[in-house]
C-alpha cells in the first residue's frame, strides 16, 4: 500500500515516465547500473522498477537515520570500502539470482556529467557473469535533492524520465594481474555508461538545442560576449537570432545555401542560428583563403549570396574581396539595420514568447551548415553537416568532459573552422558555459590578457598558437584555466614543456577532422595518455585498415552520428557526395569515412597519429612518414619552421626535400640526431632548402600543394 501511494505521489508531482522496459529484467543474474544525479535516485528506482532489487550502499550511508527508517521497505547491502569481502558477498548475491542496483559513480554528480566510475561494480559484473542493464535518470538533477543548484535552474517538481537501456555483458578482461583486470573492467563499464548517455540524446535541430539549453540554465543566464564587451544572455541572444532570421528571409529562399564571411562575434552566432531556424543553410567562408578560395567555395556550394560586414572587411583589410569575387551578391549587415519595420519588431516580440513557432518544419537529419576543408592537399571541399551530426559531436564532448555553467571559454579560433565552431561556440552554448569570442588567434599578447581579464577556464588552440601565447603571457595570466586542449596539428614538445614549466598546466591533445564535426578523439583529465590524442569518442565505431609497407598502425576509418552528410566538390557543384570507404575486402561501404590518417590504437584504446596517408614517401620500397622527418628536424631546431615534401627521383622513385627557415640545419646534424633517436638514415633528407617563410594556408597549416610544386621546381624555392 505504501509503495502504491508513494508511486502515485511521485508520478503526480514529477510526471515520472519509464521507457525501454521489455525483457531487460528477466535475466537470471542481473546488475543494474544507473547514473547518480540526486538523493531521489534510489527512491525512484525502488518505486518504478518492475522488480524488487537489492541496493548496494556504502556503509557510512546505511548507518544514517533515514536508511534505518527505510530498511523495512527497501533491501540494501552495506559496502565497506575497507573490507574486500563485501565485494565477494555482492558477487554471491548476484550468482544466487538477486538483482542488484549499484551506482558505479559512488556519489552524486556535481558537474552534470559522469563522475569517476569505480571498478568495484564492474568487477562484480565480470566475476558473476551477470547481465548489466544501464539506466539513465533525467530530471532529478533539477530538484533541490541534486547538487547542481548553483549551475542549473532548480525547480520544485521537474519532469523525471527513467530510461532503461538494453542489457549487455561485461566479460572478465584478460590480464595477468587481478588489479589490471579490475581496472580494465572498470574502463569497460565506463564505456557502457557513456554509451547509455549517448543513446538517449534527443534528436533536435540547432535552434531547438539552443532553446533546450535556455530552459535548462535559465533565459537570463549570461552566455556570450565579444570584443564589444557587451555580454548577452540566452534571452538577448535569442532576440538577435530572431531579428537576423526575419531579415534574412527577405533576400534568401528556404533551403538556399547562404555564404557568411564574418568574424568571431555575437552577430555571427546570431546569423548562424537565425539562418538555420528559417531553413537556410549557412556556408561559413574562410576569409583568409583569398579570392581564389572564395570562388572555389561559391562554385562547390552553389552560393548566390554572401553576408558580410563593411566594418569587418575594413579592419581585416579585405575590402578587395567584393571587387574580385563577383560571382555572388554581397549583402552588408550595416545596410540591414535600417530595414527593420514595426511589423518586424512585433514579429520578434511575439516569437520571444514562443520561439519554437518561428521555426520552419525541419528534421534533425536535414542539412544545417556547410564548412570547408583547408585545401592543404587540393581544392577546398564543402563539408555538409546535419543538425544531428553537429549536436552529436557536442554531446560526445559533454559525455567525456565536465564543462559546466561555471566555465568560461576563450574562443579565438575562427568559426569558419570546424574546431572553432564546435568547441568555441556550440559546446559552451549547449553546456551553459559562457564564451568570449575574439576575432583573431594571432594576437599573441592580447589573447592571454583577455583570458586573464575574463577569468576564462577553457582554452582551445593549435600547438603553434598555444606556444606563442605562452611566450608572451605573464605567468599568472592562465591561473584560472583548467582545460587547455591542442588540436588541428601535432602538439610540439616545446609547447608542452613551456606550458608545464611556466604555468604548471598540462596541455591535453586531441584529434579531429572537419568531416567528423570535428572532434574524433581527445584526452581529458579522467582518461589521458602522453603522446596520444586520447580515445575515440563514445558513439563512434573505428577500424584500422592495414597499409602495405606500414607496420605500426593503418588507415583510420570512422562511422558514427557525427559523420558529415557528404561533400560538395568544385568538380560537381551542388551534388552531395555521401561518405563511403573501402573495407579490407576492397568493397565500398556506405556510412564509413576514411580519414586518410595513419593511426595506431593501443590495447587501452588510446590513439597515436602516425601521419597523413598522403604524407608518406616510398623511398627504395620503404614507407617513410614526412611528419616524422619534420619531428626529427624540430629536435635540433625547435624555434624554426620546417616542412618535408617529396620530389620525383629516377633511382628511388621518390626523394625527400626539407624546407626550413633555419640556415644552420645540415644533413650531418640531422644524421646525428637520427642515430641518437633511432630513426633510420633513410628518413634524413639530402635536399635541404632554406626559405624565408613556409607557404601557409589561412588556418595556419603549411600549404602542402605549393610545397610539392616547390619540391619539383627548385627555382620556386629561391
Curated annotation (Swiss-Prot):
UniProt keyword Transmembrane helix, yes or no: yes
Instruction: Supply the name of the protein.
Output: Bifunctional protein Aas
Pfam families linked: Acyltransferase, AMP-binding, AMP-binding_C
Q: Where in the cell is it found?
A: Cell inner membrane
HAMAP family the UniProt entry points to: Aas (MF_01162)
Task: Choose any GO biological process term that the UniProt entry carries and state it.
Answer: fatty acid metabolic process
- Its biological function? Plays a role in lysophospholipid acylation. Transfers fatty acids to the 1-position via an enzyme-bound acyl-ACP intermediate in the presence of ATP and magnesium. Its physiological function is to regenerate phosphatidylethanolamine from 2-acyl-glycero-3-phosphoethanolamine (2-acyl-GPE) formed by transacylation reactions or degradation by phospholipase A1.
What EC number(s) has UniProt assigned to this enzyme? 2.3.1.40, 6.2.1.20
Q: Where are the transmembrane segments?
A: 258-277, 409-433
